[in-house]
Amino acid sequence: MCIRDSFAAALPMLVAQILNLLYNIVDRIYIARIPHIGTAALGAVGLCFPLVVIITAFANLFGSGGAPLFSISRGQKRNKQAVHIMNTSFTMVCFSAVVLMLIGLLFARPLLILFGASKDALVYAFPYMMIYLIGTLPSMIAIGMNPFINAQGYSTIGMFSVAIGAVANLLLDPFFIFALGFGVRGAAIATVISQCLSASFVLFFLTKKAELKVRFLHKNELSESLGYAKNIISLGTAGFIMQLTNGLVSIVCNNVLSVTGGDIYISVMTIVSSVRQLVETPIYAMNEGGSPILSYNYGARRPARVRKAMVVMSAMILCYTAVMWSVIIFAPGTLIRVFSSDPSLVKDSIPALNQYFAAFIFMDLQYIGQTVFKSLNKKKHAIFFSLLRKVFIVIPLTYFMPYVLHMGTSGVFLAEPVSNVIGGSFCFITMLCTVLPELRRMDNCD
């Protein structure tokens, strides 16, 4: 894997991830500019972020969990097994989407209160959440099955499937929010329509055009698929836990901020989270672009190419993050004003952003380690490090620093860099100490 190959693999993924980011980011940009209620509505919609994370986490549990196994099987020339893995993932994606939608619709209000919503915030958050939930199935199909398009070498098609929905959302948002006067509800409607368009294209391609085509599992295949399902869930659990704990951290942060800073700091956290999504998107793209290459060459027993892919992917990610970290530290207002022009909100967001991203480059080490572990089917390592940083470091610190050390809202934002340094370093060092010796042994055996 040379630098050219890395860019070739990562570029379509980068464009796809940026376009996918538009689903939520564009909503927030437009919502923040609704006259008179923009700042309050922005915070309220930010309270729905854990729900979006949960839906995405389940989609990736089966999609990103299945795609590396799919790639490994293709690398081993076992196409029949690869198709069975993809069909198993697809069936699980659809079933879980229906279950999540029903649970969400039944318990939307208590969930939002759990997420930290005040009575005022519920006015905007509840209708947005109810409409968004209707699009759970198309959302999960678009997210969960797109990795199988990329894993077959159709990365440009994968990018296009995301582009369809993202561009539609970009155009429909102002129409429903401002032209029709639907406000927050309009943003949710536009998102659901856009997700339906993306899902339709993904299904069309995977059922009609792809080399290896997808379908629902037949009844007589269910028992045989249990083994594949367990492996998919085992491998996808690391990313699932990482995303799910992102939602848990968001809930904890919003609850602490609502006490220490009030509703305005929910809006501040929404902006900080939005900037993080914006900055992380190319990192995700580079990881996802490199993951099939790592998996394929590992399955084909080509350790030299696995090592080279690891080095190139790591170098690209670290260089990019160094540039973005400089922008965040030295020009934070530029990024914040993308999401809101409210002077008081911008003023409160600048120190919060600087604190939150103080040691962000260490987070790269976590991402690189997680991607390598996942791509090489190292389930236990991937799951452990998913849990370590979020559950055992950042969440306790989010309570400890504001309440015990009396740091107020600053304690919430500073919990992130402390966890980045500890968790990221530990994950990366462990990856080097476990994966590199295995690759050397593979060299010797061959």
Task: Give the residues covered by each predicted segment.
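Small-residue-rich hydrophobic transmembrane alpha-helices
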Residues: 42-102, 139-158, 254, 266-326, ...
